[in-house]
Amino acid sequence: METQYGLAKGGSCLVSNMATALDEDIKLNYTIDRLCDNFADLDDEYEKIIWRNYINEVKKHINTKEPIAIFDDSDINKEYSKKLEDLDRVRDASSPDKRIVNGYNVCEAVLLSKNTNQPISVYSKIYSCKSKNFKSKNTYTLDSIKAVENIVGKKFIGIFDRGYDDKKIFDYMDKKEHSFIVRLEDTRTLLFKGKKKSVEEVAKSRKGKIAMKVLFDDNEEYELMLSYTKATLPYNKKEYTLVIVYGLSEDKPMKLLTNIKIESKEDVIRIVRLYLSRWRIEEHFRGKKQEYDFENMRVRTLKSMNNLNMMLTIHLGHIAILADKIDSKLLIIKIIYASKSLRSKTIVWLSQIARGMKEILKYAHEGIKRWQDIEVRDPRQLSLKL
């Protein structure tokens, strides 16, 4: 409860900001030390209970008719840190030159909500390749897929970026009979009518014959041309569909591989729209990093980082649940109005709601002590009996 309030009012992953937001009648250092100890010493069983309660709430708000799960990796840039546990070397994807810096990897999976397709995180793990118990990045990817399976309890559509162009992902999704759409690397080779060719070569030799228009969140409209063809993975000889998208980038067309059955041009357009919904997880990451200063967290152990990340994930999940009710709850309109955002319309409301809550809570000067059920013990004074 303290962490959730601290995140909402402080708007930051810095423990000092959360402690300041609690506004307790003790020295700030004492509050900071207590919060840091809570992150470091959180019992594993208690952690599971907290996460299970969150997932039980999430299940009420996801799209159960056609569950759509989006998987992606991110990073935490700790360029100037030296003393953190198992500090790794990662590629800073947000930098213009994609430089290698000190930091950590983050594996994330979100499910889309049932009303307005808000991204609700159901798996988020910070890890280092230098940890003793590290096996492989695919281990975390498969764990994230299994987490989605446990929640939806049936088949779902998985959306994956280029980093997941891997036969282990194809094999697992096929084995479990899940649908998938994976963006392919340019170096991927497939069999076309029995001949091995790179997808880049095939994309250059074809022309888009199916037109579609896409309006992004920045109100910029793109006219795309699509093409598709049957293709086979050389190692398993299974047939899939390669969808090629022209017009998103001036450099190269986008190549998507899917096991979803395509029978008409409407099916092709649907595949592309499903994949383009992947940007919602990008908005989720952006909200984490910009609104809550995610990369600036200053706890030293991976256990503390993951516990703080879990609390932030739960916080963002409840914001997504709020946003999913935007058409039926006046409270959410009031929160967004309080954010004083320049844009009155958007698709993912995470940033506006986060800023709105922070703006409203800045008028609270008592913290949350009076709402907490704290046991007050009677002072036991020793007395001398004559």
Language model: regions and residue ranges:
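Short alpha-helical "recognition helix" segments of helix-turn-helix
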Residues: 18
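Active-site-proximal, Lys/Arg-enriched surface segment
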Residues: 4-5, 34-116, 227-231
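Amphipathic repeat-derived elements
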Residues: 31-38, 144, 278
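Short acidic/histidine-centered micro-motifs embedded in hydrophobic/aromatic stretches
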Residues: 21, 38, 287, 291
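Short, basic interhelical loop/turn and adjoining N-cap
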Residues: 21-34
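A short structural micro-motif
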Residues: 24, 41-42, 294
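Single, function-defining residue in the core of a domain
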Residues: 1-14, 50, 65, 82, ...
